[in-house]
Regions:
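N-terminal, positively charged/glycine-rich alpha-helical extensions of SAM-dependent methyltransferases
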Residues: 2-48
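Class I SAM-dependent methyltransferase Rossmann-like catalytic core
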Residues: 42-60
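Conserved alpha-helix/loop element of class I SAM-dependent methyltransferases that forms part
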Residues: 57-75
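Conserved class I S-adenosyl-L-methionine
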Residues: 75-84
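Class I SAM-dependent methyltransferase SAM/SAH-binding core
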Residues: 87, 91-124, 129-134
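A conserved beta-strand element that flanks and buttresses the S-adenosyl-L-methionine
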Residues: 146
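A short glycine-rich, Lys/Arg-flanked "PGG" loop and its adjoining helix->strand segment in the class I
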Residues: 160-172
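C-terminal alpha-helical "lid/dimerization" subdomain adjacent to the S-adenosyl-L-methionine
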Residues: 179-221, 227-233
Length: 247
């Protein structure tokens, strides 16, 4: 659908803002850059995938992503686990263009789309691999890694080994950011489960854990863990786990 003349100039201006090679961090307004990045990503996708992207960005909204953006390093190698269509790799790559993101996902079709999106956005340093993160042939070290709403889709017996592998791939003082949900309040968990089922169906097992349980698991791996409960207009019980690897 075509926008009116006044609005048609806006995406070009936003692209110019987002693609500045070194946005000055002291004056960086994450939500402004984030909305611009989302606009660019949507325009780089085919119609069906654009619908999916709109759903994902309605769950992980600019306010939440802007918090994560400030937690990740401004530059260096960053690992994206369960990257799908590369939406968040494209997002974080636009807000800080010196980031080199490596995305891993088992779905080859999604990986191919992630490569196309990154190419259209000029993110030539990004890499994408069709593989299972638990045994992917990826080599560290990485300055950071993130796992966004993926852990509760991983079988319980594989969760700790995956997190252990991510720790080993990080450089000293590297940061692992995990975004998942907690198990309270009950109505928010139920809402989240319904949304998950709408996306993946009823056959796939889901493993939701209380935030204290996730915190203990991550701490057992030697991480210094900070837990941040992120409020939202939608009833998702978001929790960010900011995990720093020791020296």
């Amino acid at each position: 659908m075509s926008a009116g003349p006044a609005s048609s100039r806006r995406p070009s201006l936003l692209r110019a803002l987002v693609r500045k090679s070194e946005p000055p961090r002291a004056f960086y307004a994450p939500e402004v850059f984030g909305r611009a990045a989302i606009t660019n990503i949507a325009q780089a996708l085919p119609p069906l995938e654009r619908v999916y992207a709109n759903i994902r960005f309605s769950i992980l909204r600019p306010k939440l992503l802007s918090v994560m953006d400030l937690l990740l390093p401004d530059e260096g190698r960053i690992l994206d686990i369960g990257c799908g269509f590369g939406l968040f790799a494209a997002y974080f790559g636009q807000t800080q263009p010196r980031r080199r993101i490596v995305g891993i996902d088992p779905n080859a079709r999604r990986i191919e789309m992630a490569r196309k999106v990154a190419g259209k956005l000029g993110l030539t340093e990004h890499e994408f691999m069709a593989a299972d993160a638990r045994d992917a042939a990826v080599r560290g070290p990485f300055d950071a890694a993130y796992v966004l709403d993926v852990m509760h889709h991983i079988p319980p017996e594989d969760q700790l080994p995956l997190l252990e592998r991510l720790r080993d791939l990080l450089s000293p003082r590297g940061v692992l950011v995990v975004k998942d949900i907690t198990t309270e309040p009950a109505y928010q968990v139920r809402f989240t489960e319904l949304m998950d089922r709408a996306m993946v169906g009823w056959e796939e097992p889901l493993t939701y854990r209380h935030h204290r349980e996730w915190g203990e698991m991550l701490s057992s791996l030697g991480f210094k863990v900070r837990m941040v409960r992120v409020p939202d207009v939608l009833p998702y019980p978001h929790v960010l786990y900011v995990c720093t690897k020791p020296r």
